């Protein structure tokens, strides 16, 4: 399986399966002398951790991260950082009945056809359990970005099903179990999710992630444009079926006079492009949105086939998220951080000496 790494100068390689002994990752390229400890990583891991509310999976994992290498006396050494989290609450017996059939809407069928042998317990390598290590690596990237460049990355759930945030108050995001920025919609979200869980169904979601104070110049045209790399990074998150940068698909109905981000000596007059023009950061906020499908792990019977190709029906047992978008918020933040740090290091390596007579605007 060759697709377990992301990044060039800042590179993250993850390993492990949902019901294996542990999950882990190797982080390469972080500069030396960054003060870091396990507590710095644990904050975001706790935000992603399962079993924290009735609206997410009841799998109880503490997600206690261990730093195995690359840190000495509280500082990064510049060598590879090894991270590991033990799996402690696997219930593999919940999956014994699906050993010889494929869950519709999951990676069971495609993994089986591609590799000829799959770990059916909780989806194995295809499980979102793996994303805990992305969050751990992303926490390192977020700390470096903030301390060295003042970059702040914030994510929130901007839509759950048909319920959209009408106002954005980032101070409210961490004060409710949905990471939702509109306090007036929390009761509606709670009632909706209770009914959804009772029904045994699931729903999709939209997550927005914003990076502020990103310097101008990040991105490597033409194939490694910053927006292309961000789309690749965010699209790699489980259940993501769409990515927008800035206004995204809303640009289809806009006219050029509306969409162009006009400039004045005092700065840009709008940010429809989401902080990226020509594949290069403008210095404005970088804004991305991801669409996550509803999980197919349902207690409502659905049609499928066995590994022998025979027709059958099934329900999914086990513990699952009725809306995977809720816990995707810190994952999206991590993916943005990993990609931005990689491009900052690449830009610094090639273009640190570049100067122009044009003042920077935002």
Curated annotation (Swiss-Prot):
It holds the Pfam family Chorismate_synt. Its cofactor is FMNH2. SUPFAM superfamilies: Chorismate synthase, AroC (SSF103263). It catalyses: 5-O-(1-carboxyvinyl)-3-phosphoshikimate = chorismate + phosphate. GO terms for cellular component: cytosol. Pathway: Metabolic intermediate biosynthesis; chorismate biosynthesis; chorismate from D-erythrose 4-phosphate and phosphoenolpyruvate: step 7/7. Reduced FMN (FMNH(2)). This is Chorismate synthase. It comes from Psychromonas ingrahamii (strain DSM 17664 / CCUG 51855 / 37). The gene is aroC.
């Amino acid at each position: 399986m060759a697709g377990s790494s992301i990044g060039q100068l800042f590179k993250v390689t993850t390993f492990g399966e949902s019901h294996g002994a542990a999950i882990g990752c190797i982080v390469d390229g972080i500069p030396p002398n960054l003060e870091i400890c396990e507590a710095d990583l644990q904050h975001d891991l706790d935000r992603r951790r399962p079993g924290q509310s009735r609206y997410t999976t009841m799998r109880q994992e503490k997600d206690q991260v261990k730093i195995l290498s690359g840190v000495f006396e509280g500082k990064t050494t510049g060598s590879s950082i090894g991270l590991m989290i033990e799996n402690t609450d696997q219930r593999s017996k919940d999956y014994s009945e699906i050993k010889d059939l494929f869950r519709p809407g999951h990676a069971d069928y495609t993994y089986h056809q591609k590799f000829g042998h799959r770990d059916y317990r909780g989806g194995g390598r295809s499980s979102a359990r793996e994303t805990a290590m992305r969050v751990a690596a992303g926490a390192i990237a977020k700390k470096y970005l903030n301390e060295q460049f003042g970059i702040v990355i914030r994510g929130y759930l901007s839509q759950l099903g048909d319920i959209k945030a009408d106002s954005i108050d980032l101070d409210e995001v961490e004060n409710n179990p949905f990471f939702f920025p509109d306090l007036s919609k929390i009761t509606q979200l709670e009632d909706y999710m209770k009914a959804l869980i009772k029904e045994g169904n699931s729903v999709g979601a939209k997550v927005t992630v914003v990076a502020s104070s990103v310097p101008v110049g990040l991105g490597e045209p033409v194939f490694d444009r910053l927006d292309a790399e961000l789309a690749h990074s965010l699209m790699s998150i489980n259940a993501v079926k769409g990515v927008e940068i800035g206004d995204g698909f809303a640009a289809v109905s806009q006219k050029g006079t509306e969409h162009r981000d006009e400039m004045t000596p005092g700065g840009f007059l709008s940010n429809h492009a989401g902080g990226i023009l020509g594949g290069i950061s403008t210095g404005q906020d970088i804004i991305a949105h991801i669409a996550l499908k509803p999980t197919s792990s349902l207690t409502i019977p659905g049609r499928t086939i066995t590994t022998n190709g025979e027709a059958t029906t099934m329900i999914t047992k086990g513990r699952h998220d009725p809306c995977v978008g809720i816990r995707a918020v810190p994952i999206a933040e991590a993916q943005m951080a990993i990609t931005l740090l990689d491009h900052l290091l690449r830009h610094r390596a090639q273009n640190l000496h570049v100067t122009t007579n044009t003042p920077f605007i935002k």
